[in-house]
Amino acid sequence: MLDKINNDFNINKILLNLHAYRQEILASNIANANTPGHKSSDINFSKTFGKLFSNALQGKKNNLTTTSNKHISNNDNVELSNYDEQTVKNNSYVSKNNAINIDVDRINFVHNGLKYNADVVFINNKFKNIMNVLKG
């Protein structure tokens, strides 16, 4: 029974991790807005999510390399840097020092944060529903 509950939350774990990863990239863009030569980057969210989700469905895990059976692997952790889909965006406005459109990156940062928060609320509601069912 716990396996079914765990599998049900797997997609949510993937989504939250991917939103958090994208948030780091967007924050880096904003922080480096005045850094000469810095290029704006982002991930192809749907492509990366598709890869992670299909790997999860196929049971593929992103394990650490272990040289002994006594070593601990990270088979439950999603290593997003393995799916580094960073691409340089083509911005219509580029400052003289770098290729960052700060307004677009700020909007994407807020939008991604809202999606992350919505996913957290959804997960909390799932937990509440499960607890209500278990209580009877």
Swiss-Prot record:
Keywords: Bacterial flagellum. Transmembrane segments: none annotated. One of its GO terms (cellular component) is bacterial-type flagellum basal body, rod. It is found in: Bacterial flagellum basal body. It comes from the Bacteria. InterPro entries: Flag_bb_rod_N, FlgB. One of its GO terms (biological process) is bacterial-type flagellum-dependent cell motility. The keyword Transmembrane does not apply. Its main location: other. Pfam families: Flg_bb_rod (PF00460). Structural component of flagellum, the bacterial motility apparatus. Part of the rod structure of flagellar basal body. Belongs to the flagella basal body rod proteins family. The basal body constitutes a major portion of the flagellar organelle and consists of a number of rings mounted on a central rod. In Gram-negative bacteria, at least four rings, L, P, S and M are present, whereas Gram-positive bacteria lack the L and P rings. The rod consists of about 26 subunits of FlgG in the distal portion, and FlgB, FlgC and FlgF build up the proximal portion of the rod with about 6 subunits each. This is Flagellar basal body rod protein FlgB. It comes from Buchnera aphidicola subsp. Baizongia pistaciae (strain Bp). The lineage of its organism: Bacteria, Pseudomonadati, Pseudomonadota, Gammaproteobacteria, Enterobacterales.
